[in-house]
Amino acid sequence: MTSSSTILQRLTQTIEARKSADPAHSYIAKLLSSNEDKVLKKIAEEAAETIMACKDNDREQIIYETADLWFHCLIMLARHDISPEAILSELERREGVSGIEEKLSRSQNQPEPTKAE
């Protein structure tokens, strides 16, 4: 089995390399050069397929569809010049923090909405 960080690095490098590839010859280049809505719709589609696989309790499909979802999320991140390491750092920051506490801290750090005058 390949190290998860190694495959993530290779996928990231491939996606970065495809930024300059011909969209006619590369699916990744096609998504990267298209309207962002195309990528976002693909993520929504893959998320829905992952949900359906979960509802069907189909382990193989859950794995397959989650891989598709993650892959398309990596493409979305690349469009915004966000590295997977930024996401991993955020997950690491949250590690060991209660989800309830983390959510509460976010709401406490939000400015109060102003009333429309």
UniProtKB/Swiss-Prot annotation:
<keyword id="KW-0963">Cytoplasm</keyword>
<keyword id="KW-0067">ATP-binding</keyword>
<dbReference type="Pfam" id="PF01503">
    <property type="entry name" value="PRA-PH"/>
</dbReference>
<feature type="compositionally biased region" description="Polar residues">
    <location>
        <begin position="106"/>
        <end position="117"/>
    </location>
</feature>
<keyword id="KW-0368">Histidine biosynthesis</keyword>
<feature type="compositionally biased region" description="Basic and acidic residues">
    <location>
        <begin position="96"/>
        <end position="105"/>
    </location>
</feature>
<comment type="pathway">
    <text>Amino-acid biosynthesis; L-histidine biosynthesis; L-histidine from 5-phospho-alpha-D-ribose 1-diphosphate: step 2/9.</text>
</comment>
<protein>
    <recommendedName>
        <fullName>Phosphoribosyl-ATP pyrophosphatase</fullName>
        <ecNumber>3.6.1.31</ecNumber>
    </recommendedName>
</protein>
<keyword id="KW-0547">Nucleotide-binding</keyword>
<comment type="similarity">
    <text>Belongs to the PRA-PH family.</text>
</comment>
<keyword id="KW-0028">Amino-acid biosynthesis</keyword>
<dbReference type="GO" id="GO:0005737">
    <property type="term" value="C:cytoplasm"/>
</dbReference>
<dbReference type="InterPro" id="IPR021130">
    <property type="entry name" value="PRib-ATP_PPHydrolase-like"/>
</dbReference>
<dbReference type="GO" id="GO:0004636">
    <property type="term" value="F:phosphoribosyl-ATP diphosphatase activity"/>
</dbReference>
<dbReference type="InterPro" id="IPR008179">
    <property type="entry name" value="HisE"/>
</dbReference>
<dbReference type="GO" id="GO:0005524">
    <property type="term" value="F:ATP binding"/>
</dbReference>
<keyword id="KW-0378">Hydrolase</keyword>
<feature type="region of interest" description="Disordered">
    <location>
        <begin position="96"/>
        <end position="117"/>
    </location>
</feature>
<dbReference type="GO" id="GO:0000105">
    <property type="term" value="P:L-histidine biosynthetic process"/>
</dbReference>
